[in-house]
Amino acid sequence: MRTEAALQLGFCALCVMLALLGEGMGRELPDPPAVNCVWSRWAPWSSCDPCTNTRRRSRGVEVFGQFAGIACQGSVGDREYCITNAKCNLPPPRECSDSEFQCESGSCIKLRLKCNGDYDCEDGSDEDCEPLRKTCPPTVLDTNEQGRTAGYGINILGADPRMNPFNNDFFNGRCDKVRNPNTLQLDRLPWNIGVLNYQTLVEETASREIYEDSYSLLREMLKEMSIKVDAGLSFKFKSTEPSMSNNSLKLDASLEYEKKTMIKDVSELTNIKNKSFMRVKGRLQLSTYRMRSHQLQVADEFVAHVKSLPLEYEKGIYYAFLEDYGTHYTKNGKSGGEYELVYVLNQDTIKAKNLTERKIQECLKIGIEAEFATTSVQDGKAHAKLNKCDDVTTKSQGDVEGKAVVDNVMTSVKGGSLESAVTMRAKLNKEGVMDIATYQNWARTIASAPALINSEPEPIYMLIPTDIPGANSRIANLKQATADYVAEYNVCKCRPCHNGGTLALLDGKCICMCSNLFEGLGCQNFKGDKARVPAARPAVTQEGNWSCWSSWSNCQGQKRSRTRYCNTEGVLGAECRGEIRSEEYC
């Protein structure tokens, strides 16, 4: 630690000296010393749980990796097998009433649901008989993909949950139907869905501006992804806690087409020269749904995992639960597909061809119109571009670096088949633009593989059945775990950036997103200093970074408080905007 402090002080002194003496001399400041991930020590092992023969321990992140240092990629929790002489005292299973049937799993269903042709017990034990009568006529199909995946979870830090908490194969003896306009057949609605409406909406937008540097683009993308919590631009796209289930990890080849992968690629474009960026986003909405407000049917495995959570709070296992099911579930959602294209443009070619921003935007959009009078997603129309866009879209000159306007296209696709996403990328790589036929091929596959494209979140602890033993303790623990999870992976554990750079945390690594006037891992260098005729250095307010909040004080006079401090390490004269102290009623 002494060596690191000395390096920081030396770097600070060097920054001041060069800033005062070297302005306009083309001197380039070195990047700040690398900061490696620092974990806290492991807490002592818990006692051995006699019901699972498992003991657990946890640790925390103290400092995230930064300035090309090692990122924090490990897990907070740890567990191992153990042996104990203590007895497992599980509460007795719930006794079903005379009007109920007990499934082999121990759950209870209404007796009228027995032998109706539906698996109202997830284990199918209610159908060990000849169906007396089927709930739905044979013309009605099973539930569609929108119904099967309804309610899928959301992680407020960005990771995709590994499991769905709902049992959407439960119908409660009802035969609610909806006509699917894509198949023209009737689909059956699960009990958990209160309303499902099919409504085709198509939209396509191009960024209002061409981004001059990758940081401006990245900053905009991250702000769009962030959910409004007190976490700043903090993201954790990779789940790092071991799953509570052996069957939760589903490796999907389409992951390479996720927006998270695109964000990672953009964040690594720090040294690219003479390039600018433009975004084109498209969305095809097929349906909207609303979950029931009460009596939601959760999966047996979800209940089993809730029951296995220790009554005494231990953050590692609770984090694992949140990464399995999400910090929230989807109360209301929209299903369909969306794509995002980031065009890497060659500035030299744009200037040589005298192209305007407006022309580039119009030519790189697909040009989709929606025929809302029809019910098919295949009836899109394309604006005729004729040959006026050849100087923008053609890649026939792309064999030689720098001749084409479009150097590269980064693709993010959500919804639809993997094959259609591959075709889309191949078309973009070959011609630099996507046409209406490629779009239609992708759109046709969305009905069979829809994605959640918009959601209204509700805390996951709201799904815990209140009739299970220890429900209130586990609900309180999950509330604390959600707050701790956001605080654990937070930019407050990063060091500040120079010259007004914006801090972001991506998968255990802090990055400084510089304004278009500055560069370097810490935004320490003014680009104008390297020009043949040095530009005047602008006046910049140096900003520190708030530390993490302290723990809440004890409740006194119906109030409690917490504090934080302004971290200015490595940035002289920096200040923080905001309050040092906060209070709330208790």
From Swiss-Prot:
Superkingdom field: Eukaryota
Domain named TSP type-1: residues: 36-89, 543-585
Membrane topology type: Multi-pass membrane protein
Residue span(s) of domain EGF-like: 494-524
InterPro entries according to UniProt: LDL_receptor-like_sf, LDLR_class-A_CS, LDrepeatLR_classA_rpt, MAC_perforin, MACPF, MACPF_CS, TSP1_rpt, TSP1_rpt_sf
Keywords for this protein: Complement alternate pathway, Complement pathway, Cytolysis, Disulfide bond, EGF-like domain, Glycoprotein, Immunity, Innate immunity, Membrane, Membrane attack complex, Repeat, Secreted, Signal, Target cell membrane, Target membrane, Transmembrane, Transmembrane beta strand
Keyword Transmembrane in annotation: yes
SUPFAM superfamilies recorded: LDL receptor-like module, TSP-1 type 1 repeat
Domain MACPF: 132-493
Signal sequence extent: 1-26
SMART domains (UniProt xref): LDLa (SM00192), MACPF (SM00457), TSP1 (SM00209)
Pfam families per the UniProt record, alphabetical: Ldl_recept_a, MACPF
Biological process terms in GO annotation: cell killing; complement activation, alternative pathway; complement activation, classical pathway; killing of cells of another organism; protein homooligomerization
Compartments in which it is found: Secreted; Target cell membrane
Disulfide cysteine pairs (residue numbers): C37-C72, C48-C82, C51-C88, C96-C108, C103-C121, C115-C129, C136-C175, C363-C389, C494-C510, C497-C512, C514-C523
Chain ranges of the LDL-receptor class A domain: 94-131
GO cellular component entries: extracellular space; membrane attack complex; other organism cell membrane; plasma membrane
Residues carrying sugar: N246, N274, N354, N545
Transmembrane domains' residue ranges: 229-236, 357-364, 365-373
Subunit structure: Homooligomer; about 20 C9 chains oligomerize to give rise to a huge beta-barrel that forms a 100 Angstrom diameter pore in target membranes. Component of the membrane attack complex (MAC), composed of complement C5b, C6, C7, C8A, C8B, C8G and multiple copies of the pore-forming subunit C9.
Family per record: Belongs to the complement C6/C7/C8/C9 family.
Function, as annotated: Pore-forming component of the membrane attack complex (MAC), a multiprotein complex activated by the complement cascade, which inserts into a target cell membrane and forms a pore, leading to target cell membrane rupture and cell lysis. The MAC is initiated by proteolytic cleavage of C5 into complement C5b in response to the classical, alternative, lectin and GZMK complement pathways. The complement pathways consist in a cascade of proteins that leads to phagocytosis and breakdown of pathogens and signaling that strengthens the adaptive immune system.
Name of the molecule in the record: Complement component C9
Taxonomic source organism: Takifugu rubripes
Gene: c9
